[in-house]
Amino acid sequence: MDGRAASQTITDKIPYLLKAGIKPTVFSAITGIQDQRFLHRQFLAWGPSAFRFDFRHWFANQYGRGIAYKIMTGLISILLSPFIALEKLCLGYSSQWSWAMPAFLHGLQLIRSGHVDVVYSTGGAWSAHLAALWLKKATGVKWLAEIHDPMVIRSSPEDIGTAIPKNRDARFRQYLERQMINHADHVWWFTEGALHYAKQRNPLLNTAGYANGFVVLPGAEPPGGLASPKPHVYSSKLNLSHFGSLANDRSLSIILKALSALLKKYPEAKESIRIHAYGAALDSLSIEAIKKGGYEDVLIAHGRLEKDPQTGKSGRERVVQKMQEADVLILLHGNDEWCAEYIPSKFYEYLWTGRPIWGITHHNPHLDGMLQERGAYLSQVGDDAGIKATLEKIWLDWKNQGLIEPKWHPMGVDQAVVRILTETK
């Protein structure tokens, strides 16, 4: 789906793959725009729940979300509801599983006709890996697998994910991970933690006859074409800015809680500190904290930035501008155990801005190390005293116009492609 992190992770690699002489044939859902640079086939999933999801997004992209959209999607939902219930009762998998079926059949045709030498599954949605597994078993084609998020969700630091889950979708993902280790030629993850726990569950990884596993840092293309950081201009406000989605497990409420403590010591800070949320609605915990603390003027929700008709700047250009104007960029990691295996994609975009990052992280030494080596403010989820101390340091640094100046060491997508091509040749 265009604009989503899972989509950008692969689409940003395409120019570098083309430059390396690779001729891709892309299979995807119908929820994005068809690429015209190469053969790009878009398939509707065959299962009822995924069909409903894909149809909604396709119709909205084609005709908007007006009255026709409401009528058509309502009719589709009514017609498919008994089949969706049956699908959940019989299988219990996440809705997108059935996309694997058309992808497998079309892939099989291309492989047998000699048009495909390598299958590269990436996700995101695990249906791509399922289709690739079927193709590997049917044809023996070379298979490369890129895993974005952990296939197996652990519950604690002691849990390595070998227990059989009660949830059927989780059981299938556990099975699929084993199959990938057994049958794929190369598998890579985006964090050291993800590779570590996958190896714990699958000791045969990186042994003869099984998948070669390694880590690729996905990086990001310079947002808005940024090539270098711009000198920062301090204003009368300390602007802390967060970009991206929010949820109760990834909430700005933890910063508002720290702000309450700061204001007891520095009451004048309330007039100077502004927290900006771009790109998503506020989570319920943040809304509750705003009401409780009277922070309506402190935390400002801007939502998604669209094209400005007055300046002509696109939404993306406005986002880049706001990132660069921020005194400090907020990186919320979350509080689930799987954060040990996950690095927010926004981190790589932040690196291009040259602005200091305040990372509030959880059980991820890999992410902590990358933040520290570049120069950042760092706190740990659950360490309330540490979060309060970090906010106070930011406040005092800003007052003295001495905020951390991070090292300019961004990661582009080109390095990820070089790593993949080197490991898999």
Question: Language-model features: where?
Answer:
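A charged, aromatic-enriched C-terminal amphipathic alpha-helix characteristic of glycosyltransferases
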Residues: 5, 381-389, 395-425
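Nucleotide-activated donor-binding/catalytic signature segment of Leloir-type glycosyltransferases, i.e.
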Residues: 277-280, 284-320
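Conserved donor-binding/catalytic core segment of Leloir-type glycosyltransferases
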Residues: 232-250, 256-259, 421
